[in-house]
Amino acid sequence: MVRKEDTLSLVEKTWRFDNKVAIKFDTHVNQSIPHYLDLQSYTVKLSEWFLKDNTLVYDLGCATGETIKQILNLNISTKFSIMGFDNSQKMIELAKRKTSKIIKNNERVKVDFQCKDITKINLKKSNLIISVLLFPFLNLDQRKALLKKIYKSLNSGGAFICVEKIRAKNSYFEDILNQMYFDFKLSKNLSEEEILNKAKSLRSSMYLFDEKKSKSLLESAGFKNYEFFFKCFNFIGYIAIR
């Protein structure tokens, strides 16, 4: 049972990843994203194919560092580096705190967390780039630019693993999926008021495209080889290989 005080009561007009959101983020996404724990597990499991010796891994929009924490806990001997970027200083602080003990006892992986505007970062050559629920908050121009950076950054055979939210192909399916999603959040003990407030706060912050457009943007950036590994309601996960 999720305690009422663990939920996010959003009364602000615009959604922001501020200190209040960061502190309760892990609980909040588990309430708000279908199969979120499984999604994290799938993302980390997929990463095993691309964690090569002496390569760099990026987590764009790393939030509280949960994905990186799980990668650090993998039972592998590969030596590599991970950089986690987020535009929230509080998220970065929480990520460092969450992973500090693991990093201290782990000599094979170098980890660096940085608070930066992800739309303005430069990416070095890498073998794996992960992005969990960042892209819905990027407008079309930002998305195009970042996808091109990601493709250019990846080594040949390197991978981009992305989880995002999309629109349905038409209004009929969009209505059905939205209602199912609403019921899902109610089942996670979010109140109707909390769900409505969250939806209102995201009006000017979220930019969603349908699956066809997402594929088109991937291909325009250079990715021709990609596959979907998750889909539930309006949430998808895919892996694209350069």
Which positions does each model-derived feature cover?
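A conserved beta-strand element that flanks and buttresses the S-adenosyl-L-methionine
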Residues: 130
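C-terminal alpha-helical "lid/dimerization" subdomain adjacent to the S-adenosyl-L-methionine
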Residues: 166-220
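Conserved alpha-helix/loop element of class I SAM-dependent methyltransferases that forms part
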Residues: 35-53
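Conserved beta-strand signature within the Rossmann-like core of class I S-adenosyl-L-methionine
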Residues: 157-165
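A short glycine-rich, Lys/Arg-flanked "PGG" loop and its adjoining helix->strand segment in the class I
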Residues: 144-156
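Class I SAM-dependent methyltransferase SAM/SAH-binding core
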Residues: 58, 68-119
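N-terminal, positively charged/glycine-rich alpha-helical extensions of SAM-dependent methyltransferases
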Residues: 1-24
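Conserved class I S-adenosyl-L-methionine
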Residues: 54-63
